[in-house]
């Protein structure tokens, strides 16, 4: 799933009076609960924009104060389960009660989003389809937050709990609390 928003309405909506003055990249999101991605390059990607010519503008934040909750989703055997591009310092998105299993990279946040009350499994026994060692969390641009999550299998020899790689701008103070093992 790719949440990519234009700054202004695109055709055919751009020609309709109903959408005059609308700014899709600042509008509240609707519900997105109980969704699943399996065997994808990216399970969920947020914080990109579209230009009026339909070209992709990377790291364009969804500029709404939120909070918005992605509830009860499952991400299995993806290259990357959850990815959020640079979204400013807003803490406007919470990934709540998710199940992440057998992904190569579980969580890559270039923003201040929160993963809460979720279960993150390194290897369910079914293996990831890409055959690579799993990484739970990239210490990326962030700083993301992990709150009250349950971890399974991250003590295995092939599993990586953290990957300390920053990108364009590395914000310190990623926060982790309430983990159970």
Segments predicted by a language model, with ranges:
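Extracellular beta-rich repeat passengers
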Residues: 2-181
């Amino acid at each position: 799933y790719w949440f990519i928003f234009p700054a202004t309405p695109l055709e055919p909506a751009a020609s309709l009076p109903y959408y005059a003055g609308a700014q899709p990249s600042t509008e509240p999101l609707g519900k997105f609960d109980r969704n699943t991605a399996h065997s994808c390059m990216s399970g969920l990607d947020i914080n990109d924009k579209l230009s009026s010519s339909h070209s992709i503008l990377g790291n364009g934040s969804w500029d709404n104060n939120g909070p918005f909750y992605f509830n009860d989703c499952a991400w299995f055997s993806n290259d990357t389960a959850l990815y959020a591009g640079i979204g400013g310092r807003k803490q406007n998105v919470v990934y709540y009660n998710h199940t992440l299993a057998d992904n190569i990279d579980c969580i890559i946040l270039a923003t201040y989003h929160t993963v809460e009350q979720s279960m993150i499994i390194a290897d369910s026994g079914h293996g990831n389809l890409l055959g690579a060692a799993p990484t739970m969390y990239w210490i990326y641009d962030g700083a993301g937050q992990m709150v009250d999550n349950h971890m399974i299998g991250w003590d295995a020899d092939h599993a990586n709990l953290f990957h300390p790689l920053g990108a364009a701008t590395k914000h310190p103070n990623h926060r982790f609390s309430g983990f159970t093992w």
